[in-house]
Amino acid sequence: MYNRFVLNETSYHGAGAVKAVAEEITARGFKKAFVASDPDLIKFGVSKKVTDVLDDAGIAYEMFSEIKPNPTIQNVQSGVEAFKASGADCIVAIGGGSSMDTAKAIGIIIKNPEFADVRSLEGVAPTKNKCVPIIAVPTTAGTAAEVTINYVITDAEKNRKMVCVDVHDIPVVAVVDPDMMSSMPKGLTAATGMDALTHAIEGYITKGAWAMSDMFHLKAIEIISKSLRGAVENTPEGREGMALGQYVAGMGFSNVGLGIVHSMAHPLGALYDTPHGVANAIILPTVMEYNAPATDEKYRDIAKAMGVEGTENMSVDEYRKAAVDAVRQLAKDVGIPADLKAIVKPEDVEFLAQSAYDDACRPGNPRDTSVAELAELYRSLM
């Protein structure tokens, strides 16, 4: 048995790193950039921090902003046509997971036109060619899409999210600059931060976990637990910590997969447009309780990484409870709702459960589950 580990060719970290965007484009010989960013980031001047760098370097670019939260097949199709018309030879993706996921899908289809039907990319797509080179500049500290081989596109006709896994979609360069994240409001900071914690915890206990991924996930849990409260208050230390912590979590989970927290969160985004991080944060503690019997001593490690003292002297039940309690407390401290009562309609539970069971993240869960058990988990959160 052997394991594969895929990362960016190059990554930049720290305040001011955004300057590296122009340096990389020039060094790689690209002539024109296709800049993919959502309308709000353009409206509030966040994307301008990157395009100013391009302007100063005399690099030609074309903007594409037809991107919505939980990006759709239509967004991707529009992007493919816009890219073809642009004459660009690289993509600069600015934003959170929505911008980067859209950019990945566009880049894959451009280089693998036989997959022009976006639905054909669901699951592990057998593409043959690397996507258009992507330079990814995250503006949120959560999805880690800048370092993952995953992307998620919403099929609006079927009210479902498609998880796509493709080693050919990883950005060649990640530029992780905490200054690009400083304009995030508290609610978005909290939601994306809890998404990052979910990545780290699910990645640590997933069936595919191994020594190398464990190393990244435990460190990510530690960094995020120390940094998220400060990031919500917009402290420089908190922002910098979350920028690093979410990236480290991405280094891990991208290579080993996730579990049913994400499986349950994806249908909520597709059906109700629930922010992905909020859905994960609400679901995580309950699923941790459900998964506990299948995690050996890993919850002891999680509790310790989150700052719980005395874990070495705790019983199995005690350290498992301590880990779950630490997650619940962090979510509460940053203002995450405690349940799904305001989101889920009772008549939708069976559809949600079936969608969660069919989701690509479900097989990696440490505890095998069923549609009925997933339905019960949803109900327990209502």
Q: Whereabouts are the PLM-identified features?
A:
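An N-terminal, well-structured beta->alpha segment
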Residues: 1-64, 381
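N-terminal small/polar loop signature for handling phosphorylated ligands or for N-terminal nucleophile
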Residues: 42-115, 229-239
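C-terminal charged capping/lid subdomain of soluble metabolic enzymes
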Residues: 299, 309-382
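Short glycine/serine/threonine-rich phosphate/pyrophosphate-binding segments
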Residues: 18-21, 43-46, 73-76, 99-103, ...
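Carboxylate- and glycine-rich phosphate/diphosphate-binding segment that chelates Mg2+/Mn2+
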Residues: 150-256
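Catalytic phosphate/nucleotide-handling subdomain of diverse soluble enzymes
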Residues: 267-306
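Glycine/threonine-rich beta-strand-loop-alpha-helix active-site module
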Residues: 74-179
